[in-house]
Design a protein with these regions (language model features):
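Flexible, glycine-rich terminal cap/loop adjacent to redox cofactors
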Residues: 10-110
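Short, conserved beta-strand edge motifs with alternating hydrophobic and charged residues
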Residues: 18-19, 130-133
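Rhodanese-like catalytic fold shared by cysteine-dependent sulfurtransferases
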Residues: 77-88, 92-129, 136-169, 173-198
C-alpha cells in the first residue's frame, strides 16, 4: 500500500525503510505464524510513504491499519501509537505494525544506524567486520559469508576483541538481537550498524 521503494527511487524521493518480522498474534497462543512488514518513510519527518506485508494470517488487517495512516498523512509515530483490540488469538500487546514504527523511530532518533542488504553488498569488505550475534547453534546452520559469531547470549567481554578501526555490522535472525548488540557496541565506542530486518 502507498508508494513502493522502486517508485520512490524512480521519483527520486528520499526515504528510509524499516523491516520487521513478527507473529500474527501472541506467541504463547497456539498457531502464531510469522509475518514480514516493510515500511518506507520520510527521513525528514517520519511521514509514512508506503508499506508491504507478507504472511499468511492477519496480513490484510495490518495493511488496512497502515493504509489508514498513509491516507491520513500519518507518520511512523502514529504507527507506534496505533491501538487495536487486544486478544491473544488475533494480536499481540505490541503488534508488528507498532514494532515497525519503533524500529523507524530508532533509526530517525539515532539510537541505532541501520544498513540494508543492498548497501552491505556494495561495501568494501576490508573496511567492515560482520558479526553474527545469534547462538552458536544458529550460526552453525549458516550465516553471511565472512561473518564471525559472537553470540549476544555469551560474554559481553567477547565484544572487546573487535577492532575499532573497522565498521562493525551486526545481524541476527530478526533484528532485535542485532539492535541490542549495536547499542552495547555503540556505548563502548564502536562504529556499528545493524543489518535491517536481521
Amino acid at each position: 500500500t502507498g508508494v513502493s521503494a522502486k517508485m520512490l527511487d524512480r521519483l527520486q524521493i528520499p526515504y528510509k525503510e524499516a523491516i520487521v518480522h513478527g507473529a500474527s498474534h501472541a506467541g504463547y497462543y497456539p498457531g502464531a505464524i510469522m509475518m514480514d512488514i516493510k515500511i518506507n518513510f520520510s527521513p525528514e519527518d517520519g511521514k509514512l510513504l508506503g508499506a508491504q506485508a507478507v504472511g499468511i494470517d492477519g496480513v490484510d488487517k495490518r495493511l488496512e491499519m497502515m493504509s489508514a495512516v498513509i491516507r491520513n498523512g500519518g507518520t511512523i509515530y502514529d504507527l507506534m501509537e496505533l491501538e487495536q483490540a487486544y486478544a491473544p488469538p488475533y494480536s499481540s500487546a505490541k503488534d508488528p505494525v507498532n514494532m515497525a514504527g519503533f524500529v523507524a523511530d530508532n533509526m530517525l532518533s539515532g539510537k541505532v544506524k541501520m544498513i540494508s542488504w543492498r548497501e552491505l553488498k556494495d561495501m568494501d569488505r576490508s573496511k567492515v567486520m560482520l558479526v553474527d550475534v545469534r547462538t552458536a547453534e544458529e550460526f552453525a546452520m549458516g550465516s553471511i559469508e565472512g561473518a564471525v559469531n559472537i553470540s549476544l547470549d555469551g560474554s559481553r567481554g567477547e565484544y572487546q576483541k573487535l577492532p575499532k578501526d573497522r565498521t562493525i555490522v551486526v545481524f541476527c535472525a530478526i533484528g532485535l538481537r542485532g539492535y541490542i548488540a549495536a547499542r552495547v557496541l555503540m556505548q563502548h565506542g564502536y562504529d556499528v550498524v545493524n543489518l535491517n530486518g536481521g
